[in-house]
Amino acid sequence: MAQQSTAAKRKDKAKKRIVVIEPTGQVHIRASFNNIIISVTNSTGQVISWASAGKMGFRGSKKNTPYAAQVAAQNCAQVAFEGGMRKCEVFVKGPGSGRESAIRTIQNAGIEVLTIKDVTPMPHNGCRPPKKRRV
């Protein structure tokens, strides 16, 4: 008879994870043709903050612009800097525009970039690419 309501059960499951923010971390930038996603993690890979162009309010073709990447990177870097991160390694993946502007914005936010690695997956002649657009 002493049964918890479903709302109380959901609150128990939705506990906020406690992530340790270290002075040195990682920034993962995923730049596709349609969007850009930026994740700031600690050295073990736990996400401290994340942002995307879509989350920042950009829609459609405006999501893959360098300005959208700049706004998303600013949001992410600000949360990480306030948490105590001062240095980072940057991992860039994907062919999209806005990769350089995101890195520049992270540096301007006060986080020193130690290394920049391009981890874009390259096929050894795998899947057939999409056909060329005809406008």
UniProtKB/Swiss-Prot annotation:
GO cellular component entries: ribonucleoprotein complex; ribosome
Listed Pfam families: Ribosomal_S11
Entries under PROSITE patterns matching the protein: RIBOSOMAL_S11
Annotated GO MF terms: rRNA binding; structural constituent of ribosome
Membrane-crossing segments per the record: none
GO biological process: translation
HAMAP family associated with the record: Ribosomal_uS11
Function noted in UniProt: Located on the platform of the 30S subunit, it bridges several disparate RNA helices of the 16S rRNA. Forms part of the Shine-Dalgarno cleft in the 70S ribosome.
Family indicated by similarity: Belongs to the universal ribosomal protein uS11 family.
Protein name: Small ribosomal subunit protein uS11
Organism: Cytophaga hutchinsonii (strain ATCC 33406 / DSM 1761 / CIP 103989 / NBRC 15051 / NCIMB 9469 / D465)
